[in-house]
Amino acid sequence: LEALKTADLLVLFLRFQDFPDEEMQHIVDYLDRGGPVVGYRTSTHAFQIKRPDAKFLKYTWNNGAKNPAADFPGGFGRQILGETWVSHYGRNHTQSSRLLLQPDQMNHPILRGVKDVWAQSGGYTADPIAGSTVLALGQILDGMTADSPPAGDKKQVPVAWYRTYEQTPGKPGRVFTTTHGASEDLLNDGFRRMAVNAT
C-alpha cells in the first residue's frame, strides 16, 4: 500500500480486511490528501477491524452500530464511499439486476456511452449518504439473464453514485461507488464502459 504515496487513483475491490496499522496509515494518508476513490461492490464493507486497540478502528464497516453518536458512523463505507453494508437485496445467484440510468445524469462523464447495463451479481440495499448523486438505480430481475422480468416485489434502489468526501482534517476527494462490480458484471459492455469512465 506504500504505492498510495504517489498514486493518482485508489480502486477498491475489498471485503472485511483487517490491515495492520502501518498499512492502513497509507490509505488514511491518501484520503487525507483528497485522493480520488473508486469502490466496487463489497468495498462498502472493505474493513472489519477486530483489534480493539487498532489505530483506525473507526474505519470498520459497522462502526457505531451500537452507538449512533460514534465518530465516523458506518466506517469507511458510509463516510468515504457513501454507504456501508446493509444487506443483500434480492436473492443472490438467482436474481440479477438491470441498472436504470438516471435521465437527469445522462450528460455526466461517467455515463458517457453507457447503455443496456445489466449485472449478474445480486443487489445490495443502499441509501447513499447526503451529498451523493445517484447515477443508476437497480431493478431486481427474476432470473439470471438480461431479459428476465422485473421482480414485482422489489422497489428500485441506488446502485451507482458519485460524491465528494472530506477527511477531518483533510482535503476533499471525489468518489464513484457501485454496489455491483463482481467479475461477471464486467462482461457486460455497459457496465464495463461505466467502470472505464469512472476511472
Where are the language model's segments positioned?
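Catalytic-core region of carbohydrate-active enzymes that cleave or remodel glycosidic bonds
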Residues: 196
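Structural motif
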Residues: 9-13, 177
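Catalytic beta-strand/loop cores that center a nucleophilic Ser/Cys/Thr
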Residues: 6, 78, 82-171
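Solvent-exposed, acidic/flexible segments
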Residues: 3, 16-24, 188-192
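A glycine-rich, often tryptophan-bearing local segment used as a flexible ligand/cofactor-contacting loop or short
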Residues: 12, 16-112
